């Protein structure tokens, strides 16, 4: 499983599977999206819960949820009250970013590439919560899944910046080899994933 899915969807999935198939242990590896893709391609895992663009058309990918990625900052940030902030202006401020190879960073970098821009990170972390804490402390703008900072946003401790660019959304997929035999337990896992609650961050 990729990291954001592991934090917000995997507990429900794992719990439902344990109740449905109590005699089948579910072995789970949580890692960044690039390494999850490599494990699936190498047949080291049978099924992946994957965020963002599916890397290989050979895989069967079925969407089950999605989440928004936001530009978030403290309420006293210089850009906090501005409207339709140009991307180039946002990039002049310190950025707190996920590491390269993560689904969130890949979507962010792809958005900038569409505009011919690149970003330099002031902070880079595998831990989105560390980036939230950095933004709360005034270290800069964090670019993370909004679901991770839902409490801070609701309380007004962080605000969404109004960036003049396409909304950043990552879709979540269950991915597997279409020609590989699926046991009844694997088929049940797929069924559970496809019926899991999409969550408050579901993007219609």
Question: Could you say what each language-model-derived stretch is?
Answer:
Residues 9, 72, 159-202:
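A late-sequence structural motif
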Residues 1-57, 125:
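Central regulatory/effector-binding core of bacterial HTH transcription factors
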Residues 1-3, 60-70, 94-100, 142, 155-168:
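Short beta-strand->loop
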Residues 52-53, 75, 146-148, 165, ...:
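Short secondary-structure boundary segments
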Residues 32-37, 41-45, 50-51, 106-161:
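Hydrophobic hinge/microswitch elements
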Residues 56-95:
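Flexible hinge/capping segments at coil-to-helix
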Residues 79-80, 94-115, 146, 182-186, ...:
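Secondary-structure junction motif
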């Amino acid at each position: 499983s990729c990291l954001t899915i592991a934090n917000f969807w995997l507990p429900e999935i794992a719990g439902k599977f344990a109740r449905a198939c109590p005699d089948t242990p579910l072995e789970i590896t949580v890692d960044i999206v690039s390494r999850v893709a490599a494990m699936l391609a190498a047949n080291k895992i049978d099924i992946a819960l994957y965020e963002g663009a599916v890397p290989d058309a050979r895989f069967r990918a079925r969407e089950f949820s999605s989440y928004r990625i936001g530009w978030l900052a403290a309420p006293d940030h210089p850009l906090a009250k501005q409207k339709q902030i140009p991307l180039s202006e946002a990039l002049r401020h310190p950025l707190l970013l996920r590491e390269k190879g993560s689904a969130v960073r890949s979507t962010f970098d792809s958005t900038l590439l569409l505009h011919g821009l690149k970003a330099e990170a002031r902070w880079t972390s595998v831990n989105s919560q560390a980036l939230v804490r950095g933004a709360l402390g005034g270290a800069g703008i964090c670019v993370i899944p909004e679901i991770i900072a839902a409490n801070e946003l609701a309380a007004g401790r962080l605000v969404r910046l109004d960036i003049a660019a396409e909304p950043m959304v990552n879709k979540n997929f269950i991915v597997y080899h279409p020609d590989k035999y699926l046991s009844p337990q694997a088929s049940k896992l797929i069924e559970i994933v496809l019926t899991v609650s999409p969550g408050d961050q579901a993007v219609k």
